[in-house]
Regions:
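A short, well-structured juxtamembrane/interface segment
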Residues: 28-53, 59-62
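Catalytic core of membrane glycerolipid acyltransferases/transacylases, capturing the structured
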Residues: 50-105, 149
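Non-catalytic C-terminal accessory region of glycerolipid acyltransferases
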Residues: 2-25, 48, 71-72, 93, ...
Length: 226
């Protein structure tokens, strides 16, 4: 247990023991009731079939059902704030590893750790507008990660036929039981190793636009507005 955890009260530690387990069970139940369809699954599979790994990028708004996409070994970037500890534990119960940090807090150390786990043979999953926004604005960290690893960034999203939209900064989406969920993979984006500041910004904006496009495309399946 790290020093920060030692400062938690016994009540907080009890909640940390209970909530992630309960959350993962509820989420698994929800996923079992939902009918899922994946569009363009060949986009990541083309890399996986060649033994290559990818960086999957999805909006914070749409992260809830991402654990139920067909994945191989994947590590998820999760923020270092207090809520992130609960999320990291829940992700572990769902069978995934986590890297702690974000595009702001702990960014450099998280970047180094993501490079390390990628080179050991893992996909990386990130929410490039998380953990605090602005909504649907890509931060530069994911682009820098792609430059340093040579991995393609593949945007991915989902939409649901029936869902609850929360009033949070990201308008977080909770698909309702027995709804339909459509996942959609976007086209890969490569960032040259020698990319300078201007090229990195160009890549950031291109990724942001592709993520916007696939989100709109997924929402059109159920005629929703993101």
């Amino acid at each position: 247990m790290d020093l920060a955890m030692e400062q938690w009260s016994w009540k907080d530690k009890l909640l940390l023991f209970i909530i992630p387990r309960f959350y993962s069970l509820v989420l698994r139940f929800l996923a079992r009731t939902i009918r899922k369809e994946v569009f363009f699954p060949e986009r990541p599979r083309n890399f996986w079939d060649q033994g290559q790994h990818v960086i999957a990028a999805f909006w914070h708004q749409r992260l809830l059902m991402m654990p139920f996409l067909p994945w191989g070994k994947v590590s998820v970037l999760i923020s270092q704030h207090r809520d992130g500890e609960f999320i990291a534990r829940a992700v572990k119960f769902l069978g995934y590893d986590s890297v702690r940090g974000s595009t702001t807090r702990g960014g450099i150390s998280a970047l180094r750790e993501m490079i390390r786990v990628f080179r050991k043979g893992s996909d990386i999953a990130v929410t490039p507008d998380g953990p605090q926004g602005p909504k649907h604005v890509v931060q530069i960290g994911v682009v820098e990660l792609a430059r340093l690893t040579g991995a393609p960034i593949l945007p991915v999203t989902y939409s649901a036929s029936c869902c609850k939209v929360f009033g949070s900064w990201d308008n977080f989406i909770l698909p309702l039981p027995f709804s339909k969920v459509a996942y959609l993979w976007g086209e890969p984006l490569f960032v040259p190793r020698d990319a300078g500041k201007d090229k990195l910004e160009e890549s950031r904006l291109l990724l942001q636009e592709r993520m916007r496009q696939i989100t709109e495309e997924a929402d059109r399946i159920f005629q929703k507005k993101s």
